[in-house]
Amino acid sequence: MMSSVSTESKLQQAVSLQGVDPETCMIVFKNHWAQVVKILEKHDPLKNTQAKYGSIPPDEASAVQNYVEHMLFLLIEEQAKDAAMGPILEFVVSENIMEKLFLWSLRREFTDETKIEQLKMYEMLVTQSHQPLLHHKPILKPLMMLLSSCSGTTTPTVEEKLVVLLNQLCSILAKDPSILELFFHTSEDQGAANFLIFSLLIPFIHREGSVGQQARDALLFIMSLSAENTMVAHHIVENTYFCPVLATGLSGLYSSLPTKLEEKGEEWHCLLKDDWLLLPSLVQFMNSLEFCNAVIQVAHPLIRNQLVNYIYNGFLVPVLAPALHKVTVEEVMTTTAYLDLFLRSISEPALLEIFLRFILLHQHENVHILDTLTSRINTPFRLCVVSLALFRTLIGLHCEDVMLQLVLRYLIPCNHMMLSQRWAVKERDCYSVSAAKLLALTPVCCSSGITLTLGNQERDYILWSKCMHDTSGPVERPFPEAFSESACIVEYGKALDISYLQYLWEAHTNILRCMRDCRVWSALYDGDSPDPEMFLQSLTEEGSVSSACPVFGLPQQLPRKTGPQLAPRKDKSQTELEWDDSYDTGISSGADVGSPGPYDDLEVSGPPAPIDPPKHIQEMKKNALLLFKGSYIEESDFQDDVMVYRLCAEKDSEDMKDSQEEAARPPAEAQAEVQSVPINNGPLLSTQPETDSEEEWNRDNSDPFHSEPKEPKQEREPEAAPESNSELASPAPEAEHSSNLTAAHPESEELIAQYDQIIKELDSGAEGLMEQNYPTPDPLLLTKEEEGKEESKGEKEKEGKKELEDEEDDFDSFIAEMPAVETVPSPFVGRDEAAFASRHPVRTQSTPFTGPFISVVLSKLENMLENSLHVNLLLIGIITQLASYPQPLLRSFLLNTNMVFQPSVRSLYQVLASVKNKIEQFASVERDFPGLLIQAQQYLLFRVDMSDMTPAALTKDPIQEASRTGSGKNLLDGPPRVLQPFLTHRTKVAEAPPNLPLPVRNPMLAAALFPEFLKELAALAQEHSILCYKILGDFEDSCC
């Protein structure tokens, strides 16, 4: 019998036997063993009939213990020569000493104490011996017998010692794979579990504490071994429950997570490590998820593929999907935060791929997860902020599949721009015209307050058109007298805002990082690659073809492989996702016809019966609709005419509410179903806000339509639409468009008649409109000048019906210039849907659409003055993330202010102009606006920890960098010299943050953020003009 404590301590304190005669050691070892054998035989029932089981005198047990201690010491210290066994080890093997000692333990009461003694003995042998003991079956066999006898034990102490020994054995296996065969065949009677040490570890996979961690570490040794040994991989996949236990264990651990998180304060929007370390159940789940990530990283492809399939079908689909659609907002918000945390914690592409496939392709109750997540951005709850944080994580992955489904697939056809503008997609803005226009949107009322400028830089100026940063591309060096005013962002002799230099540096770094990550993308997305016509054709041809298990590449996958898989969602999203009613996912009867989801059967026999929206949508809608204030609709049947649009919404609110759950509504009617929109939400009602930029537009003659007739000016110059008198002309094209659907939808005739009646009601001018009480969070009132303009507009609307025919003629000539592809039916509708679509047409490519995500983000951005600070910080972060992508389609859509889009598509520039107008309107009615602006700026500076962040963080969420996946380097770390101007302001507000009055808190913080946002966008526009020809091989040299 061996006493583990005394044996271990004595062996550790023993003197080394180096220099002692090996023969002497051998004689001592044999003498000790002879004494032990006498005692063993005395109590062996086979050799002594008087021996009784379990009855061993204490003195004899102690004697065996002392002899075995010395024997183990001699065996461990023996040094072998020339890879041969030492005499002591040879004697141990020949006499089968280890098996006899194990049987001796069994003859006694085989208690937990006895098991622990045996386990510790073998742990010392395998870790401290100078010879490879495990190569010998007489030593390995009793070890396996011991391990088998310990399986199924419930004593924590025994489990701890068992896992420690298993961890040591796996470590030896990883270093010496030659003994693997012995482990497989030593215990042949184990059957399917003949790889015993692996099978014993499986129950401890999800165990918490040090036992679980050691078990997972041991399994990782086996996983790395499987990568080089196909036999091990096949055994694990075919004969063990490793992958099912690992995947379904995630489901069990997830069920123990809190369904509602403790209130973290208004700034909280995502789970950081400091948060989840306080939740033991979440720590346990994250440990298991991290282990899955590690297994997929090092294991054989057979194991990797089986594991990701089990995680998808055993955790994501049956557990996470329903959790994302719980009834209460708190539960949905918590699940969304968990999903965001999971995405940020995963580093292995294969595991990340199935999470992305789940988000982008999976349908829950016939609604794609992506559609549901997108719709929640427009909610008034904190769910909005958590959803924005999730999309920030998704966009930050720089994954082609994600960007293709969110944005690019809607831009590839190029139908959002005029046909004559397609050449401008690849245009290089060498003279920084777009940056100048973006900076020109800075409201005059926001130019005062805290300045971020160094006084000694009054002579600093930058001629951005020199393109000095790009040495590999064409170098343009025009003479100074040749510069136009827009070529120089900073006027000569004018002090330069030092924070703008930091924005430039940050933009340079972010764009380079994004370009480096996008090198593996399958296409350039520049208007030609992928070819728009081929892309549309591939979607049309493959739209009705379903894949039993969709292939989801990350990120090298070709777009035509990913596109058709989301064809059903495209159909639905075009007709259903452009709502003000953010939870109105009322599924039309043609929503998922023709192109089944990734795991649906291919059966399209005819139009399905109308179905109600999913239950979770119906329940959450009851609360969401009551609080939601409205948002910008990218494409409406009223051409963004806010007053008409609002009146129609107010007048039809009850009728539309009753018909929301009816099936197969026409697009025109669906567009009419909206919620009340704030009066200042949408196009500008004043002619003043864009004068600077518009004069620059005309002065530079940058509009490609300048040489053409300008009758339909509001359509051809969408940027000028806010200040043009288009309230009368804009309904005419839409009225004609609606009339094209009259044959299939008689209801649209009533809509047009109703619309005409509303125009008549506007004859009384804007006063009647202002008498209505609209729920706006801020007193954004029209000034007298604007009211006069509304009156003049009302007078012009009296003549609207007389001019209707002329306007329709103009529109006929206008649409003749549109791209031919815009007139074809939607490629996202399968051919099998042709008959059904004749009765239930969906949105076609003749109605340009930039996607639900862009629509809802711009919608939320346009309500910037009503959003909380944290919503605006996340929105700004997402838009700047998108603007950092080098793909010309996306870059031109967001940053090219010269691009002329279709009348129904609003650009980021127009939304920013609308925000500018709202800020100026608010400033005109707020008496203490300058003082409140200074307080707001001081508050923002107070939030920035100047010890590790620069003023560029004014438009960044302080948590954003900490939670971003990828490099841990803070991109906002700037030169110390740049920080000096802000340290003074930091000390001024160090005692307590300024206390902004609650009624004006959100508008004032938005007004303080807006100029910084414009600087960041302008910096991105300028850096793109320099880096668009960057050689890929120079990325590493350029990135700091």
Curated annotation (Swiss-Prot):
One of its GO terms (biological process) is protein localization to perinuclear region of cytoplasm. It comes from Homo sapiens. Probable component of the FTS/Hook/FHIP complex (FHF complex). FHF complex promotes the distribution of AP-4 complex to the perinuclear area of the cell. Residues 677-690 have a biased composition (Polar residues). Residues 555-613, 653-746, 769-808 are annotated as: Disordered. Belongs to the FHIP family. May be a component of the FTS/Hook/FHIP complex (FHF complex), composed of AKTIP/FTS, FHIP1B, and one or more members of the Hook family of proteins HOOK1, HOOK2, and HOOK3. May interact directly with AKTIP/FTS. It comes from the Eukaryota. Residues 653-664, 696-719, 783-804 have a biased composition (Basic and acidic residues). It holds the Pfam family RAI16-like. This is FHF complex subunit HOOK-interacting protein 1A.
